[in-house]
Design a protein with these regions (language model features):
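N-terminal secretory signal peptides
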Residues: 1-7, 14-26
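General helical structural elements
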Residues: 9-14, 31, 204
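Bacterial Sec-dependent signal peptides at the C-terminal "C-region" and cleavage site
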Residues: 26-32
Length: 208
């Protein structure tokens, strides 16, 4: 006796999909004739994004500060933070001689000790840091840099040749009075030798 021919696998899959749709109260839509092709409409031009609001801590720390640029730091594809550069005058070179502020708005949770150790590593790339400086700066940054989470804002204000002042979400954390620390710390983002040249270009408003 001949057995009935087994329906093709493609039919079985179609029947299974139809049954699943029916169980969910849905019906497959019949195919519609293709609409006549029309010339593609060019996409609308997206207006430039408005500048971010001035962080409250800069009102007294950096009078007349203006937003200069914003850049995004990613690591292995992960969004780490958005960086903003603020100053009263346009920033030139590495900005070491100018009062300015860097604002980091974090996009994920990070441990303060990790932020401190990474900062020291980047600073050591830009200039000679001896053992005494390394130990002192790491200790200070570990105390100044808290654990952060998505949305936290960490602000560093540069007082050229004098000190760096730190704020978390507008609250003063403390300062490190050390001209060389200040130069190398802000050099992480603004030195021509930064490890993130694209981010530097974005912060400077497209100028290198």
């Amino acid at each position: 006796m001949k057995l009935p021919r087994r329906p093709p696998r493609r039919w079985l899959l179609q029947l299974g999909a139809a049954a699943a749709l029916a169980a969910a109260g849905l019906r497959p839509v019949a195919a519609q004739p293709a609409a006549p092709t029309t010339p593609a409409t060019p996409p609308a031009t997206t207006p430039a994004s408005p500048p971010p609001a001035t962080p409250p801590e800069l009102t007294s720390e950096l009078p007349g500060a203006r937003w200069r640029g914003t850049g995004v730091l990613r690591f292995l594809g992960l969004h780490i933070y958005d960086a903003q550069l603020w100053s009263a005058q346009a920033v030139s070179g590495d900005g070491a001689a100018q009062p300015l502020a860097l604002v980091l708005v974090y996009a994920r949770q990070l441990v303060g000790e990790q932020i401190a150790s990474r900062s020291l590593k980047e600073m050591s790339r830009l200039g000679r840091v001896d053992d005494e400086q390394s130990a002192r700066w790491l200790k200070a940054m570990t105390q100044l840099f808290p654990d952060v989470r998505d949305g936290d804002r960490l602000t560093g204000v540069q007082r050229p040749g004098v000190a760096t002042r730190f704020f978390l979400n507008g609250q003063f954390r403390g300062e490190l009075v050390d001209a060389e620390f200040t130069r190398l710390f802000f050099g992480i983002w603004l030195s021509p030798r930064t490890s993130e040249p694209r981010l530097r270009e974005q912060l400077l408003g497209g100028r290198s």
